Amino acid sequence: MTDLNDNICKRYIKMITNIVILSLIICISLAFWIISMTASTYYGNLRPISPWRWLFSVVVPVLIVSNGLKKKSLDHSGALGGLVVGFILTIANFSFFTSLLMFFLSSSKLTKWKGEVKKRLDSEYKEGGQRNWVQVFCNGAVPTELALLYMIENGPGEIPVDFSKQYSASWMCLSLLAALACSAGDTWASEVGPVLSKSSPRLITTWEKVPVGTNGGVTVVGLVSSLLGGTFVGIAYFLTQLIFVNDLDISAPQWPIIAFGGLAGLLGSIVDSYLGATMQYTGLDESTGMVVNSPTNKARHIAGKPILDNNAVNLFSSVLIALLLPTAAWGFWPRG
């Protein structure tokens, strides 16, 4: 009887806690909306953000991050960073949000997939991924900055990607998509390639065979996975455009977004591999037979110099792809 009462008490406390948290979130959303309305009235040229958008931008990232903590996809510092990134991208543009969401969900699933196999291959493998704030920053800093610039340029809301009518805003949209697709492509390649590939990876700089897990090692399976990862993010962006953008009939076609995402995923993975092969140390610990990312007395050098770590490589790859691809896309993008 005591155990039953304890369970009822715990459920009651949990229910009350959820109600209190939801009430606080609603209050925060309303406070942001009031600030938005005040700023719009004072400055005159600012478009107020609806209370529903504020509410969605606060509630949904909280729910996603809470689920990520529960499933060990994030640690506590990663959850805090994820809240900031999620809020800014969601309030800026729902297409940004869905792209980020698909990247996070797919990456988390693939990180856990075949975990026992990856444990034997990766000396730094963590159960569930457990991404910390550094990893969140290196994957989310570029999209977050672009989302802020987008809001300054265009204000919150969804727009068609159309260089002939809104060059700067369209460039930033594609740049943000490129950064997320690059991160997705690299993650899909590193999580799927080592498990499914039947052949040994080859170092991207010399094309020599290297052990599984070597930074800069590529396989056909990994490259195809990176293409699919970027395409997956591109599809999420494209579908959100179809739902939320009103004037698509008088704008440039949006379907190239899907191809752009796939290209960003593939090229991002290639750039990441090249940086990893040249600026990231890889050695083989002969006592364990596992690949390591830092020099030790027992490690035999395979490739790279200890200049960058994996997080820095991811950040540099994201920056390069985000800067270069939208400019290249401008020359080929259909005109409305």
Curated annotation (Swiss-Prot):
It holds the Pfam family DUF92. Its main location: membrane. It is a multi-pass membrane protein. It is found in: Membrane. This is Transmembrane protein 19. InterPro entries: DUF92_TMEM19. Keywords: Membrane, Transmembrane, Transmembrane helix. Belongs to the TMEM19 family. The keyword Metal-binding does not apply. One of its GO terms (cellular component) is membrane. The keyword Cell inner membrane does not apply.
